[in-house]
């Protein structure tokens, strides 16, 4: 700032040398250095997604209602008509955009942490898959970056495979947010949607499901490797009904992105969270990251800890239209074993101690 003021003073005095000298010194100003600019772009890219995740749907709904009360009401009416006519599109595979998935903003998003995608086995385009993503974390940051964008090159690492990241169906009832999500290939985590993708959308599809859901997000915290899986068997039944192979996916570092106040079972805080989850579909978490300006103060920006998502070995699943409980239990046990093996194989390679264990609840 002193350099800029000095340059301006030089201009007022009529000395061009001061201006030229100031321009020459601009790269030496800390907040104008290339690395600083890039870092701030990374923070902005992450913050825009966090704010989109938290408030875009509600904000756009409020704006739409406001526009209805102005002279521009026709614009809101036309969009609402389009939204009604297009209501079922998210449930039929959505409307992905390669252009949006390849935005430069997602590469800045990736590099902030950074986020990496590790491929362990090839996937056949002639098969369909269900990816079980663990852990959920607060916002599934690794899942979004790896499977909702092309920032880590998922389509190049798994050629012929089209990933469909599944999220709460309620998000697709929100104006503008629904278009934003669909452009990334994101779909509702609804039975009708998954059935459509796995049976009427050809082959080479991979539905990515955060199996632990809201219950798992309530228990996530730095240093903990806990997944909610013991009673989560619906995704296995769906895989059997469609003959879709199961693929365990573990994201090391997902739980390090935010710090959360975890309420104990039986506490008033946990009671409120469970009631909210029951009636609304998701659980409110009391969490914080760092601020835009400093990693030492609280804010909504996640902590810049590495997130490495490892895609495990696919489990071949036969097509059984009416699987028995025994069938479901068998393939669920195989899935749990495969996930445990994946965690144990990569934990020391990705910074965890050999003594750290995966807790399955």
From Swiss-Prot:
Keyword annotations: Acyltransferase, Cytoplasm, Endoplasmic reticulum, Glycerol metabolism, Lipid biosynthesis, Lipid droplet, Lipid metabolism, Membrane, Transferase, Transmembrane, Transmembrane helix
GO terms assigned for molecular function: diacylglycerol O-acyltransferase activity; retinol O-fatty-acyltransferase activity
Function: Essential acyltransferase that catalyzes the terminal and only committed step in triacylglycerol synthesis by using diacylglycerol and fatty acyl CoA as substrates. Required for synthesis and storage of intracellular triglycerides. Probably plays a central role in cytosolic lipid accumulation.
Superkingdom field: Eukaryota
Species assigned in the record: Xenopus tropicalis (Western clawed frog)
Lumenal topological domain: 62-65
Alphabetized PANTHER family for the sequence: DIACYLGLYCEROL O-ACYLTRANSFERASE, DIACYLGLYCEROL O-ACYLTRANSFERASE 2
Catalytic activity: an acyl-CoA + a 1,2-diacyl-sn-glycerol = a triacyl-sn-glycerol + CoA; all-trans-retinol + an acyl-CoA = an all-trans-retinyl ester + CoA; 2-(9Z-octadecenoyl)-glycerol + (9Z)-octadecenoyl-CoA = 1,2-di-(9Z-octadecenoyl)-sn-glycerol + CoA; 1,2-di-(9Z-octadecenoyl)-sn-glycerol + (9Z)-octadecenoyl-CoA = 1,2,3-tri-(9Z-octadecenoyl)-glycerol + CoA
InterPro entries: DAGAT
Keyword Calcium set for record: no
Top class in the EC scheme: transferase
Compartments where located: Endoplasmic reticulum membrane; Lipid droplet; Cytoplasm, Perinuclear region
Cellular component, GO annotation: endoplasmic reticulum membrane; lipid droplet; perinuclear endoplasmic reticulum membrane
Topology within the bilayer: Multi-pass membrane protein
Pathway membership: Glycerolipid metabolism; triacylglycerol biosynthesis
Entry's transmembrane regions: 43-61, 66-85
Cited Pfam families: DAGAT
Family: Belongs to the diacylglycerol acyltransferase family.
Protein name: Diacylglycerol O-acyltransferase 2
Chief localisation class: endoplasmic reticulum
Cytoplasmic side: 1-42, 86-361
E.C. no: 2.3.1.20, 2.3.1.76
Alphabetical GO biological process terms: diacylglycerol biosynthetic process; glycerol metabolic process; monoacylglycerol biosynthetic process; triglyceride biosynthetic process
């Amino acid at each position: 700032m002193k350099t800029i003021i000095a340059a301006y003073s030089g201009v007022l005095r009529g000395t061009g040398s001061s201006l030229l000298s100031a321009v020459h010194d601009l790269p030496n100003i800390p907040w104008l250095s290339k690395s600083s600019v890039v870092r701030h772009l990374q923070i902005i890219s992450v913050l825009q997604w966090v704010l989109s995740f938290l408030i875009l749907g509600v904000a756009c709904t409020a704006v739409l209602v406001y526009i209805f009360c102005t002279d521009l009401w026709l614009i809101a009416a036309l969009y609402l008509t389009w939204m009604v006519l297009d209501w079922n599109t998210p449930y039929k595979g959505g409307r992905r955009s390669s252009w949006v998935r390849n935005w430069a903003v997602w590469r800045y998003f990736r590099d902030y942490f950074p986020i990496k995608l590790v491929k362990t086995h090839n996937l056949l385009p002639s098969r369909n898959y269900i990816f079980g993503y663990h852990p959920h974390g607060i916002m599934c940051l690794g899942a979004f970056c790896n499977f909702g964008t092309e920032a880590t090159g998922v389509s190049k690492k798994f050629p012929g495979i089209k990933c469909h990241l599944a999220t709460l169906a309620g998000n697709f009832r929100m104006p503008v947010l629904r278009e934003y999500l669909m452009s990334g290939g994101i779909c509702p985590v609804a039975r009708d949607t998954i059935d459509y993708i796995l049976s009427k959308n050809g082959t080479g599809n991979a539905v990515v499901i955060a199996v632990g859901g809201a219950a798992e997000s309530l228990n996530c915290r730095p240093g903990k490797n806990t997944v909610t899986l013991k009673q989560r068997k619906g995704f296995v039944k769906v895989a059997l009904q469609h003959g879709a192979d199961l693929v365990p996916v573990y994201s090391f570092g997902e739980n390090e992105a935010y710090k959360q106040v975890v309420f104990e079972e039986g506490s008033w805080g946990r009671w409120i969270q469970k009631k909210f989850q029951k009636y609304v579909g998701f659980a409110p978490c009391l969490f914080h990251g760092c601020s835009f300006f400093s990693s030492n103060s609280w804010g909504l920006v996640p902590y810049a800890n590495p997130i490495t998502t490892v895609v495990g070995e696919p489990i071949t699943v036969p097509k059984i239209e009416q699987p028995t409980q025994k069938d479901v239990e068998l393939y669920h046990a195989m899935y749990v074993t495969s996930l445990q093996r994946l965690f144990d194989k990569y934990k020391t390679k990705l910074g965890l101690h050999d003594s750290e264990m995966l807790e399955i609840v």
